[in-house]
Design a protein with these regions (language model features):
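Short loop->beta-strand "edge-of-pocket" segments that line small-molecule binding or catalytic clefts
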Residues: 57-61, 79, 161-176
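C-terminal motif of bacterial Sec signal peptides marking the signal peptidase cleavage site
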Residues: 17-20
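Extracytoplasmic small-molecule ligand-binding "clamshell" domains
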Residues: 32-34, 38-45, 49-122
Length: 279
């Protein structure tokens, strides 16, 4: 009897040990899978994983710049060169160019919307400057432009010097005002400025003669020129456009830059520029 009891006791002990080991192994496997999953997400970048979890890339674009980012009044859709460019980034991250959410921005609102996380990136005629690089990651440039001047044909202006003492309409928080102030100082002339919240407002001010000139990057002006206005030949302060993202979203910035450079190398960027008639 004692021998039987001893055998049963030993058997139970072995079962308990086996169960314990099995449980421990299962937990270890589960923990290993968990760790592996976390390591994978970490390797990819938490910022990219966050976009994948949302299932959509949120992008700030212009809605008042024909050819770049413009809300089509007939369809209600936002379309343009920078919209198409952003779709390629969505495709790279999410595998589908349509997994994109577009948010209209202006020169004044694009920074704050990026700062508070309402959008993941900005593709909105955003000029790269050393000062802005302190606040945001910028991709390599995808387009180079310069400040142009749109005036009424009947005004007779042919150069910036002709606008001495006149009022220039510019967008709020843009680099245009500073560029023209520096050029005016170089030429020994004086300019006055009136700032507006959107480009259509500046064009309306030009048409109603509240300003004498509409100044912004020349490629943007191309979308506003009409039979009664003309863009002067001179260009000031050559500047480059880049896609901006938050400084701590380093993996996103890396992916954005890869797409931009791949498109430049393959010729796709030039095809997009040609498609939208950007000069």
């Amino acid at each position: 009897m004692k021998l039987k009891k001893l055998i049963i006791t030993l058997g139970l002990g072995a079962c308990i040990l086996m169960t314990g080991c099995g449980s421990s192994s299962s937990t270890a496997q589960s923990g290993g899978a968990d760790t592996s999953s976390k390591a994978s997400a970490s390797a990819e970048g938490a910022d990219i994983q966050k976009i994948k979890d949302k299932g959509v890339l949120k992008v700030g674009v212009k809605v008042d710049v024909p050819k770049f980012g413009y809300k089509n009044p007939d369809t209600g859709e936002i379309e343009g060169f920078e919209v198409d460019l952003s779709k390629q980034i969505a495709k790279k991250i999410l595998g589908d160019e349509n997994k994109i959410e577009l948010q209209g921005v202006t020169a004044k609102t694009r920074g704050p919307l990026l700062d508070n996380g309402e959008i993941d990136m900005v593709a909105a005629t955003f000029t790269i400057t050393d000062e802005r690089k302190k606040s945001y990651n910028f991709s390599d440039p995808y387009l180079t432009d310069g400040v142009g001047l749109l005036v009424k044909k009947d005004a007779g202006y042919t150069s910036l010097k002709d606008l001495n003492g006149k009022t220039i309409g510019v967008a709020q928080s843009s680099t245009t005002k500073k560029a023209l102030e520096e050029e005016a100082a170089n030429q020994g002339i004086s300019l006055k400025f009136s700032e507006f919240g959107s480009y259509p407002e500046i064009k309306a001010a030009l048409d109603s003669k509240r300003v004498d000139c509409f100044a912004v990057d020349a490629s943007i002006l191309n979308g506003y020129v009409d039979d009664n206005s003309v863009i002067l030949d001179d260009r000031y302060n050559p500047q480059e456009y880049g896609i901006a993202s938050k400084l701590d979203n380093k993996e996103l910035a890396k992916v954005i830059n890869e797409v931009v450079n791949d498109m430049k190398t393959s010729g796709e960027m030039d095809k997009l520029i040609e498609k939208w008639g950007i000069k």
